[in-house]
Amino acid sequence: HVDGLAHLRRREDLPDMARLTFEAPAPPARFIAPKGSVTLDGVSLTVNTVERNAFSVLIIPHTLGVTTIGGLREGDAVNLEVDQMARYAARLMETR
């Protein structure tokens, strides 16, 4: 299910990929970790970096071309789903 909306804060188009930096709402942001997974508008991606509520992903040209991710511009909102395993781990730690 969708956990919230993330907003594209920065898009860097590089020769062999694009780096997209999003800002996540506070509640689900705590479940986002480097090398973890997020789903943006139904596209499952690996998180590259995390800083506070911001996170970045690296997108290859093929993915940019065949998904809605390629058309995103700064300020656009996307549906955000966080890694379910991160939720389970957090819940386990809370109940200890």
Q: Model-predicted segments: where are they?
A:
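Conserved loop->alpha-helix
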Residues: H1-R96
